[in-house]
Amino acid sequence: MGCSSSALNKAGDSSRFGSGVTSNENSSTVEHNKFCVDQPKPCTPGGEAAFHGNTQRESHPSLERPKASVVPTANGVKSYHQPSLANDETPGKEATDHSRPTKKIEPLVQGGECEQPQPGGKDDMLGTEEVKKDVEARTEVPSLKGDAEIKPLRLSSERDSPGAPQAGTMKFLQTAENILPLETTQELPPKEATGKGAQPQILEAIPKENSSPEIEGIQSAESSGQQQLVEAPGEAEQPQALETVLKENETSQMPGRSQPVPTPVMNKSPCEAPDGLRNAHEPQVTGGNRVQPAETGETAAKVEMAREIHPDKEEQHIEGETGEKVEAEMKNEKESEEAETKEKETGEAVDLGAAGAGDRRA
């Protein structure tokens, strides 16, 4: 420690007597020697002279270097004049300042490592480079963290298969916040659209179902009407039949006609029916409604039954049309009754024909 402080003091004295450039160069060489001491040497007077001689020897080649008062640095331009003035003014402070870093650097020197610092510009460059490296290292660390966080996503997307449930669950959990709203927005409108589209269909189906009884009633009414029309003649034939019947009735009621008028085809029978019976069996027209004539077979049977039950009326109607009034059957019935009573009383048969002839003569 004592050697280094004395050497520095001597170097400061030499720098005072030299020029500004030489003092700067000597200070730089002193700094070189300060950092480049390989091993601590014992404090001997001969060693101090040798150390001082070495400093002078090293200072002479420095004179041969080109003189430059300005050195470029990373942050700007730096001159050597200011440090020389500072060194001239405070030599004691420099000695004390140089002694302090020697204490801190001694462990490095003992380790056998000799780091020769370069001039101020290069030191600044190294400092900036180290800062850049630190910044890059710090930026690389989060980037590595980001890659580590992103890799599971890539692996999950690449390994996403039915056989890898963990990757699928990781992907689902990581993308649930983004995917769920999209799925809801994409799926809900179709559902709402289908619901709205289905409601009119349901409403249309409900009125159809509600109206089905009415339709069935209408169909049943139509079917019953069709059955009646099937049993009766066709609709197109009905107006024609009605027209023919009305025409025949009009012709039969016309004056000057004493002969009976033939009935229409539907009411035709082996015997010509009188006008009254014919009108009774003819269909009657009611206001605006369709007239459905009775069945032909039923009408014929009814006419025959009426003739069998009321033969006298038929004959009377026929005789009325011809203008003759004869009550033959009434007389025949009376004669038959009288003959029966006589047979019971006398036991003799009476000729009905003779009795009838006598009655007619009388």
From Swiss-Prot:
This protein's record includes keyword Phosphoprotein: yes
Bias (Low complexity): 110-120
Identification of the protein by name: Glutamate-rich protein 5
InterPro entries on file: Glu-rich_5
Coiled coil (UniProt feature): none
Record-annotated disulphide pairs: none
Region (Disordered): 1-169, 183-362
PANTHER family for this protein: GLUTAMATE-RICH PROTEIN 5
UniProt modified residues of type Phosphoserine: S161
Superkingdom as given in the UniProt entry: Eukaryota
Polar residues: compositionally biased ranges: 16-30, 220-229
Compositional bias segments (type: Basic and acidic residues): 55-67, 90-106, 121-139, 146-161, 304-347
Keyword Phosphoprotein set for record: yes
Record's keyword terms, sorted: Phosphoprotein
The encoding gene: Erich5
